[in-house]
Amino acid sequence: MSSKILVLPGDGIGVEVADQAIRVIDKLNDLGLDATYEKELVGGASYDANGEPLTPEVLEKAKQSDAILLGAVGGSKWDDVERSKRPEAGLLGLRKELELFANLRPALVFEALASASTLKDDV
């Protein structure tokens, strides 16, 4: 059964990151993965093309996908756009509608600051 992946490059470096992710998917498909992908607009790119940072059509495609790869959204180009139409609203809309509430990022604690950090070895 094929997996459906929605690729949302977004803005700035997100476009380059998404292009490389697609190369990985293509290579994995060559090695036996069964995945299809579709690229759509989100964030500032969607705002520029559609006047909305996340269109209902893209949201529906996201709901129908097995996975979503999102590059990055935002940039100074859209600083003066109404808050509800800013690129970040597209990301927030995806999180809300898909009930995604975690944003995991790698963290590094410098030894000299470990005692002041909220990151602990055990809880």
Regions found by a protein language model. Give the residues of each.
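Glycine-rich phosphate/diphosphate-binding loop of Rossmann-like nucleotide-binding domains
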Residues: L6-D30
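Anion-binding alpha/beta catalytic cores of soluble intermediary-metabolism enzymes, centered on
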Residues: M1-G12, A35-E38, G44-V123
